[in-house]
């Protein structure tokens, strides 16, 4: 089994654990596109809050990890609910980003693709 297969298998296992967690609590009834998108946004805001009024290296690593995990969990729930293939989505988006941000224009630059 290669590394990518292991990652896919591990992601499937994690997805099943998340689904089991949700099912045991009967929370799937609340998981629609609007509420999942809002939950993702709120968790992203909580991640931002870890850095509010602090320098980038002053955030609590444990709190940052918790918020990042929440974002990933909601992303996995969203993808599973709507039968999105996360691997396919990520690779497709990376391909789009490669076209938007060609190395010769984007390397070392923080500009948005519309500014090239």
Predicted regions and their residues:
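Flexible "arm" and connector segments at domain edges
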Residues: 2-68, 72-116
